Amino acid sequence: MKLPKEGDFITIQSYKHDGRLHRTWRDTMVLKTTENALIGVNDHTLVTESDGRRWVTREPAIVYFHKKYWFNIIAMIRDNGVSYYCNLASPYLMDAEALKYIDYDLDVKVFADGEKRLLDVDEYEMHKQEMHYSPNLDFILKENVKLLVDWINKEKGPFSKAYVSIWYKRYLELKNR
């Protein structure tokens, strides 16, 4: 499959481990693709939940997906600074329909002041039992939480101020041409 190119719009689909569609984002603008990663932006993007509810994202957000890491990262650009929402999730795959991944409930939120919180641990434990996550999957996800926190602490990749600034600037250039 041909990779989307800068300025293309794609759909993102999040699934649960049992194969159910969880959430869909329409019209994410692609900023960069490589063999293993995709960087995009959501700005007033339509989101549809599995129960049919719809909402629109409030602020611009740089999104980062990778084919080798078990997480994706959303850098939300707000008036009080950049906040991050990080989903523990399968590496993504891309087909003609959408960018797709499996959401594994655990999330790490980083507030603009640097405070970090691990979210949805109870939901993860419940789904781990209900959907029979293997011990190996559980290990991979917990190791990737550690890796993610290390990236946050070291301001690596999407967690660097320069990264957000560069990609947001590029988005504005593409949006305004």
Curated annotation (Swiss-Prot):
Transmembrane segments: none
Active site: residue positions: R23
Catalytic activity: a ribonucleoside 5'-triphosphate + H2O = a ribonucleoside 5'-diphosphate + phosphate + H(+); a ribonucleoside 5'-diphosphate + H2O = a ribonucleoside 5'-phosphate + phosphate + H(+)
Keywords: Hydrolase, Magnesium, Metal-binding
Gene3D superfamilies, sorted: FomD-like
Residues bound to Mg(2+) 1: N87, D103, D107
The keyword Hydrolase appears for this protein: yes
EC class name: hydrolase
Disulfide bonds: none
Family, as annotated: Belongs to the Ntdp family.
Protein name (database record): Nucleoside triphosphate/diphosphate phosphatase
Organism of derivation: Streptococcus equi subsp. zooepidemicus (strain MGCS10565)
